[in-house]
Amino acid sequence: MSEGRNDDQIISGFEKNDLLQHKYTRTLISIIETSFAEKINIQELANRLHLNRSYMSELFSKDTGMSIKSYLTEKRMQRAAIMLQDPNRSVKNVAASCGFEDSLYFSRAFSKYFGISPQQYRRQILKNEKK
């Protein structure tokens, strides 16, 4: 009878694998949070982590329950909402600061995410601040 790995060794191997997978996700989140204002390419992210793009996307989705693109959009929209509270910043400036080269595309994405345009959002925020 050959001596193979026991159950504890196998479980330990799975735990190490899970820890490594979570490390990739944490690293990816960190990269996104520090560079979401840049034009981020998912393939470039995979290259930075030395991972296959599909595998990286699968890991991220498994750990977070959302796609990399959805997470990136969420971070950009959260930042845009904060920036739009400054009446001195143009929508075009906010768009560029959040990684959107095209302010029209940004406005459509913002409207889809929040259900109102950036201009409407700003008016609501400023109106509420005056109350």
Language model: regions and residue ranges:
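Append "Primarily bacterial transcriptional regulators
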Residues: 43-52, 56, 60, 94-101, ...
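Compositionally biased, intrinsically disordered low-complexity segments
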Residues: 1, 13-14, 32, 49, ...
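Basic, amphipathic alpha-helical hairpins
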Residues: 2-13, 17-20, 26-41, 60-64, ...
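…primarily DNA-binding HTH/wHTH and HhH modules…
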Residues: 108-131
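Bulky hydrophobic/aromatic packing residues
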Residues: 23-24, 45, 54, 75
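Terminal helix-turn-helix DNA-binding modules in bacterial transcription factors
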Residues: 30, 34, 39-43, 62-101, ...
